[in-house]
Amino acid sequence: MPAPILPLIEAAAHWPARGALLGLDLGTKTIGVAVSDPDRKLATGIETVARTAFTADAKRVLALAAERSACGFVLGLPLNMDGSEGPRAQSTRAFARNFARLTELPIGLWDERLSTAAVERALIANDVSRAKRAKIIDEHAAIYILQGALDRLVALNRAG
């Protein structure tokens, strides 16, 4: 059975109370990958996967999930500023549908508007060269996306 693909809050109900999550930032040329600690407090970058073909890309991401005993995924969904879904969001959803056929781990979608821009500003502010930024931007965006999702889940647990 394919993995469920749900908004973050709904996906969280399908994840066990404890266990690492993998955060993914889909770029056109790379996939940034981050992982949380089992208590879901902190996101850390682990790899930038160079995109080649879907099967190879998915195989690498699934291997990273297995290596870290992940129990689910947080996939950044690049919405337009007005909240609508454009071509990039549609492409991300297509990736999620195909990826879900290869795993049973629930996939949570998280609004990633401006994540790459925010990360790029931070890297520029820290004098990271353009060449170095190009190599690490998607991994850092994955950290940003996953940490935002983790923080949202903590806030909901405190409120709820």
From Swiss-Prot:
Gene Ontology annotations of biological process type: rRNA 5'-end processing
Gene Ontology cellular component annotations, sorted alphabetically: cytosol
EC id: 3.1.-.-
Keyword Nucleus belongs to the record: no
SMART domains: YqgFc (SM00732)
GO molecular function, one term: nuclease activity
Subcellular location field: Cytoplasm
Name of a matching Pfam family: RuvX
CDD domains reported for this sequence: YqgF
Role description: Could be a nuclease involved in processing of the 5'-end of pre-16S rRNA.
Keywords: Cytoplasm, Hydrolase, Nuclease, Ribosome biogenesis
Coiled-coil regions listed in the entry: none
InterPro entries: RNaseH-like_sf, YqgF, YqgF/RNaseH-like_dom, YqgF/RNaseH-like_dom_sf
Protein name per UniProt: Putative pre-16S rRNA nuclease
Family membership: Belongs to the YqgF nuclease family.
Top-rank taxon, per record: Bacteria
Organism: Rhodopseudomonas palustris (strain BisB5)
